[in-house]
Swiss-Prot record:
HAMAP family: Phosphoglyc_kinase (MF_00145). It comes from Chlorobium phaeobacteroides (strain BS1). The lineage of its organism: Bacteria, Pseudomonadati, Chlorobiota, Chlorobiia, Chlorobiales. This is Phosphoglycerate kinase. It is an enzyme of class 2 (transferase). The gene is pgk. GO terms for cellular component: cytosol.
Length: 397
């Protein structure tokens, strides 16, 4: 999917409205606990201000539900951004209105302003045309660099593009499109997808779309037990989606018909309770005792999955292999992250979907060893499902 980007336009002397994803975690004192998302936007910010653009940034923060919630003000973000850039960032009192417009018009070349939380207005999430037009009136160029919200048709991601031209992708979105797009449309083979997570229901569309593209699918996470039940295996107390057993059977049959190498675990780590102190044991699939549940993939599965990953040329990973937040059940996920980093060091293109898999890679300290970690959980999932993302579709081709 080719979209015009910051490289295709001149920003000098123009007011540039850029949608960023500054939805950062705050503690109870409104201190930012992780500024990764702010740092990720810096390449696009630097480019615009170095080119002499007058930059107006906009973002949401949290879920204020269309009301002004002072604890969700973007003021701490403006402060952190000014520290990172070593330059002052004007903080607007609102994202629309006369005062914000006057502040925008007063900007000089290379100056930056951050609008207040977009979601203080209910019209943002409703993609209200009048609200989108008012946002658009502040700028002469629109840039979207918020991949994390690209799957939402909101006023600041989709509606705004109808009222300001050019509308282009920032570097972050350009990078997402490059890696995710290449994996889905023109992958180097063998192409392996690793899917984890608790529920099949959240991954049906991804599986069905990837069946048209991949050579091998490795399945982990609690959703394996619904597949095992479909195969008539005993699963003990493990999590099963009973209403999806028939669907699991259908997916197994589809993989077989299309000659896709779909690998389920051969052993799991079982425990009697969901706790860090629980006694654990590795058991073969189908051999989970009635009073126990599977909470991670086992050592034999780790070996098999790692071999598949190391033999691949392209790997896409979405979803953890077990309950990685609890130490005894994190080994499978961490081992897969390690195999992915080892494969990448040998030239494999590795792409990690946002959310839990990204968190696992960070936890393992392996982020720098991965080709691309997506910045959008929901957006990368919808991209892998083959869906159009409204915030991307609206940009200039």
């Amino acid at each position: 999917m080719e979209k015009k980007s910051l490289y295709d336009i001149s920003c000098k002397g123009s007011r540039v409205l850029m949608r960023v994803d500054f939805n950062v975690p705050l503690d109870e004192h409104a201190h930012i606990t992780n500024d990764k998302r702010i740092i990720e936007a810096l390449p696009s910010i630097h480019k615009i201000i170095e080119d002499g653009g007058r930059l107006i940034l906009m973002s949401h923060l949290g879920r204020p539900k269309g009301k002004v919630v002072p604890e969700l003000s973007l003021e701490p973000v403006a402060k952190r951004l000014s520290e990172l850039l070593d330059t002052s960032v004007v903080m607007a009192g609102d994202c629309i209105g006369t005062e914000a417009m006057q502040q925008a018009l007063a900007l000089q070349d290379g100056e930056i302003m951050l609008l207040e939380n977009l979601r203080f207005h209910p019209e943002e999430e409703k993609n209200d045309p009048e609200f989108a037009r008012e946002l658009a009136s502040m700028g002469e160029i629109y840039v979207n660099d918020a991949f994390g919200t690209a799957h939402r048709a909101h006023a600041s991601t989709e509606g705004i593009c109808h009222y300001v031209q050019p509308s282009v992708a920032g570097f972050l979105i350009e990078k997402e499109l490059k890696y995710l797009g290449q994996a889905l449309n023109n992958p180097e083979r063998p192409f392996v997808a690793i899917l984890g997570g608790a529920k099949i229901s959240g991954k049906i569309d991804v599986l069905e779309n990837l069946f048209n593209k991949v050579d091998t699918v490795l399945i982990g996470g609690a959703m394996i037990f619904t597949f095992f039940k479909a195969q008539g295996l005993s699963v003990g107390k493990s999590l099963v989606e009973d209403d999806k057993v028939e669907l699991a059977r259908h997916l197994l049959q589809t993989a077989k018909e299309r000659k896709i190498n779909m690998l389920l675990p051969e052993d799991v780590i079982a425990a009697s309770e969901f706790s860090g102190d629980a006694e654990t044991m590795a058991v073969p699939v189908g051999g989970i005792p009635e009073n126990m549940m599977g909470l991670d993939i086992g050592p034999k599965t780790i070996d098999t999955f790692s071999r598949e990953i190391l033999a691949a040329k392209t790997v896409v990973w979405n979803g953890p292999m077990g309950v990685f937040e609890i130490e005894p059940f994190a080994k499978g996920t961490i081992a897969i992250a390690q195999a992915l980093a080892d494969a990448t060091a040998k030239g494999t293109i590795s792409i990690v979907g946002g959310g839990d898999s990204a968190a696992a890679v960070m936890k393992a300290g392996l982020a720098s060893g991965i080709t691309h970690i997506s910045t959008g959980g929901g957006a990368s999932l919808e991209f892998l499902e083959g869906k159009e993302l409204p915030g991307i579709t609206a940009l200039n081709d």
